[in-house]
């Protein structure tokens, strides 16, 4: 989240010093500053058994939608601070109602020798267990990474992390007699955690998961993470997700959109890659006393002097929206949670208080006369929210009305979830392997299922569209193996593009099938033709083949662009006509089985295909509906002189050769060579990588114009300049090209263009420049009398193309004589186009 989530704070102390102390310590990470109690706690066997049973019920979803709350320990009447004094007598954990499934012990400002800890282990745990509420201790992630608490006493080595994990579980779970551990991971606004600290925290977290949680040795304890971080910003979550019982995501304040849940929706799209919806809980915050800006969430109703009880009403609150929200895919959420449940029923301050600061509150300013005071709560809001979720029919348990077959129902509940609302949201794979399954009725309710595997279901007699998920009509995958008892296979009208995944050889009792009205390619060489013939053979083993018991007609195969094209070289005669490369060489459509259909005539022939006189393509299927449109494709041409253009049109006026790249919008589809007439030899940019041996300007800038990249410009403060370069061997040059100043992508300024310039070669082709001293060479290269001009620029075109009549030379120079304006003339690239001479020819030329 972009905004600062200064979460889980309290400012409820009376005196100014105490107020500031609370302010500095109430972020979740303040948990790290509290020394864990050293006393050993022994809980009675009965409480251990009850707690284990509660955890099992919660984990198995038998409690329905969960409601959880964070109780701030310093607001319990038994809590005392470092001074030994009672802090707030108004509330007690003992009064938390049965509607709260999980109560989090969120401790701060509570001394290690406070009576609270004995009350927790000797009274609260027992009382809350009796009513069905589990208790979980919350600690900050810095207890795991070496920053604070126990973690400072253990080395960051495998043995040390293992010992630290054991100490954490003993101190915070076993000795306190609670039912699990919750680790809080939030964004640090100052003194941010390092990657190394997060890596250590993850290692310790994994060691804790070996001890408690669903995958731990003690499965009677819950292992939970609560966080303000999204998936991409939480490497610890990604590393431990498979071991978590629940992920509690803090969504305090508006989350965007009309329903204020946009962030939740987008986050869930990522979370569902790591956890099930039944592990996902979203949270709101009650109003904390004396909270400053940055910690005012407006998740509950604002105070109304005309209605003092408005804080107990859930209508119109964000808390209610969270209770009603469900993921669109994956399943039903586990439930919701609240922070500062001890403030349940207290209305929120109004918007007029939204900018109040710590300093103002410390000075006794901008405090609300009613809601900033501590008051006794009866947990009305929590009760209402739990009741609202419990009344949600989507949480009704799947029964025989949904899925009549008991064996099928059991497998669906195991993999999908036990609630009716899970059926329509489940979007993963369902694997059915129990031979006791006789009927598949009810699977149609799995409207988002991505893959269905039917394996060894020998007692299933038929598979028909009315009992298959709606997603089968889209892109869901169907796998059938070992279906030896299947007699009727009906996949009619499911938009199936292939029969892949269906073990047709195993359908030994098949008496009829209907695969008509799909998108299958049943042409002679396709794989589906072979599968169809096997299906017909299976039916023929039991009865005579008829139209009624073997339906495969009315196919409408979907068209695709070919992955490869056969044409690697193309040819046009010199006919002075304009030709379209896309139309002539890049065309055609293929089926899912890669059957190529080039044009409408070929499609008409394809439609005539038949099996035993029965046409398999739908008569009303048209070429226009099948063919792929190449309108969005782009063609890039490189001529023999390396001139480039983006067009599919070529006018065949002279012998030429083009290198053709066709783009489908993302990648090159085909690459081909196109010859016009007798073709032409593809030239080389001989200047690319040439050695700059002299210049009137900066040599590092000069090297940019022969690096093969149209980017940085060469320029000098003078309006005239020159560059001399060595092509490293004798060449024969036919053309040259200059990329003028406006091609610099940084400026695109025509006033930087060159108006006049000259391309030159050395008069003396036998000269050995390498034998000269640097000063001698610089003087020689700068002397105009040593050069012959072979071509000139007389216009300020963006890209100037010049002709040279088969010039042979190794050393070249380009001179800028005039720009188009008072600005220093520039150019980004110079190309000399032609071929390098073989060594024997080069020697002859030099001689």
UniProtKB/Swiss-Prot annotation:
Keywords recorded for this protein, A-Z: Calcium, Glycosidase, Hydrolase, Leucine-rich repeat, Metal-binding, Repeat, Secreted, Signal, Virulence
- This protein's source sits in the domain of life called Bacteria
Q: What is this protein called?
A: Endo-beta-N-acetylglucosaminidase EndoSd
Identify the stretch annotated as signal peptide in this record. 1-36
**Which Pfam family name is an example for this entry?**
LRR_EndoS
Where does this protein hold Ca(2+)?
A: 704, 707, 829
Q: Where is this region: carbohydrate-binding module (CBM)?
A: 683-836
One Gene Ontology term from the biological process aspect of the record: symbiont-mediated evasion of host immune response
**Residues annotated as binding a glycoprotein:** 107, 188, 250, 252, 288-289, 295, 339
Read off the InterPro entries from this record: EndoS-like_Ig-like, EndoS_F2-like_TIM-barrel, Glyco_hydro_18_chit_AS, Glycoside_hydrolase_SF, LRR_dom_sf
Q: Could you read off the lineage of the organism from its UniProt record?
A: Bacteria, Bacillati, Bacillota, Bacilli, Lactobacillales
């Amino acid at each position: 989240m972009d905004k600062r989530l200064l979460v889980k704070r309290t400012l409820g102390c009376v005196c100014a010093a105490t107020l500031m102390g609370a302010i500095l310590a109430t972020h979740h990470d303040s948990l790290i500053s509290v020394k864990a109690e050293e006393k050993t706690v022994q809980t009675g066997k009965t409480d251990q058994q009850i707690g284990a049973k509660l955890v099992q019920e919660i984990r198995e979803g038998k409690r329905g939608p969960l409601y959880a709350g964070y109780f701030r320990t310093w607001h319990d009447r038994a809590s005392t601070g470092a001074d030994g004094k009672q802090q707030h007598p108004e509330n007690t954990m003992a009064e938390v109602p049965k509607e709260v499934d999980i109560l989090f012990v969120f401790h701060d400002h509570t001394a290690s020798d406070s009576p609270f800890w004995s009350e927790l282990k000797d009274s609260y745990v027992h009382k809350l267990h009796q009513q069905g509420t589990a208790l979980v201790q919350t600690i900050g992630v810095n207890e795991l990474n070496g920053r604070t608490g126990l973690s400072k006493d253990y080395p960051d080595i495998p043995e040390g992390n293992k010992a630290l994990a054991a100490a954490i579980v003993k101190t915070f779970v076993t000795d306190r007699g609670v039912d699990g551990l919750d680790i809080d991971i939030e964004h640090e606004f100052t003194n941010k955690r390092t990657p190394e600290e997060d890596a250590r925290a993850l290692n310790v977290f994994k060691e804790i998961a070996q001890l408690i949680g669903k995958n731990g040795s003690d499965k009677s304890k819950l292992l939970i993470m609560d966080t303000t971080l999204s998936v991409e910003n939480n490497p610890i979550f990604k590393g431990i997700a498979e071991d978590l019982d629940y992920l509690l995501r803090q969504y305090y304040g508006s989350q965007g959109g009309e329903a204020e849940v946009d962030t939740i929706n987008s986050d869930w799209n990522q979370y569902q890659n790591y956890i099930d919806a039944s592990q996902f809980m979203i949270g709101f915050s009650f109003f904390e006393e004396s909270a400053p800006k940055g910690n005012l969430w407006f998740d509950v109703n604002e105070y109304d002097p005309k209605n003092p009880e408005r804080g107990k009403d859930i209508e119109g609150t964000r808390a209610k929206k969270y209770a009603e929200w469900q993921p669109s895919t994956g399943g039903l959420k586990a439930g919701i949670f609240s922070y500062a449940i001890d403030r349940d029923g207290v209305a929120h301050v109004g918007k007029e208080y939204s900018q109040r600061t710590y300093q103002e509150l410390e000075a006794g300013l901008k405090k609300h006369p009613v809601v900033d005071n501590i008051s006794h709560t009866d947990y009305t809001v929590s009760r209402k929210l739990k009741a609202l979720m419990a009344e949600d029919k989507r949480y009704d348990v799947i029964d025989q009305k949904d899925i009549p077959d008991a064996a099928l129902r059991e497998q669906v509940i195991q993999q999908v979830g036990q609630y009716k609302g899970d059926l329509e949201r489940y979007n993963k794979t369902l694997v059915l392997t129990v031979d006791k399954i006789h009927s598949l009725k009810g699977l149609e309710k799995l409207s988002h299922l991505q893959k269905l595997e039917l394996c060894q279901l020998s007692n299933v007699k038929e598979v028909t569209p009315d009992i298959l998920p709606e997603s089968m009509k889209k892109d869901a995958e169907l796998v059938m193996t070992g279906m030896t008892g299947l007699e009727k296979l009906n996949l009619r009208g499911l938009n199936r593009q292939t029969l892949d995944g269906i073990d047709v050889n195993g359908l030994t009792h098949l008496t009829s099938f209907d695969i008509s009205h799909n998108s299958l390619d049943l042409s002679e060489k396709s794989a589906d033709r072979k599968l169809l013939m096997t299906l017909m053979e299976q039916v023929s083993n039991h009865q005579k083949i008829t139209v009624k018991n073997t339906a495969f007609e009315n196919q409408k195969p979907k068209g695709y662009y070919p992955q490869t094209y056969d044409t690697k070289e193309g040819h046009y005669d010199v006919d002075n006509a304009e030709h379209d490369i896309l139309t002539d060489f890049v065309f055609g459509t293929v089926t899912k089985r890669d059957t190529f259909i080039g044009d409408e005539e070929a499609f008409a022939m394809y439609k005539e295909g038949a099996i035993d006189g029965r046409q398999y393509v739908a008569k009303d299927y048209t070429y226009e509906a099948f063919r792929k449109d190449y309108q969005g494709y782009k063609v890039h041409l490189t001529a023999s002189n390396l001139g480039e253009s983006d067009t599919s049109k070529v006018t065949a006026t002279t012998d030429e050769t083009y290198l053709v790249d066709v783009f489908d919008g993302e990648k090159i589809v085909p690459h081909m060579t196109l010859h016009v007439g007798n073709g032409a030899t593809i030239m080389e940019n001989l200047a690319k990588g040439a050695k700059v041996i002299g210049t009137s300007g900066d040599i590092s800038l000069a090297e940019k114009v022969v690096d093969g990249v149209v980017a940085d410009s060469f320029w000098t403060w003078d309006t005239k300049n020159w560059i001399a370069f060595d092509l490293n061997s004798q060449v024969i040059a036919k053309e040259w090209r200059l990329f003028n100043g406006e091609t610099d992508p940084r400026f695109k300024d025509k006033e930087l263009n060159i108006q006049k310039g000259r391309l030159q070669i050395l008069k003396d082709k036998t000269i050995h420049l390498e034998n000269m001293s640097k000063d001698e060479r610089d003087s020689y290269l700068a002397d105009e009398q040593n050069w012959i001009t072979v071509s000139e620029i007389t216009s300020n075109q963006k890209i100037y193309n010049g002709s040279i009549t088969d010039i042979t030379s190794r050393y070249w120079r380009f001179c800028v004589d005039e720009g188009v304006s008072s600005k220093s003339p520039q150019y980004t690239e110079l190309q000399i186009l032609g071929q390098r001479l073989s060594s024997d020819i080069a020697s002859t030329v030099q001689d």
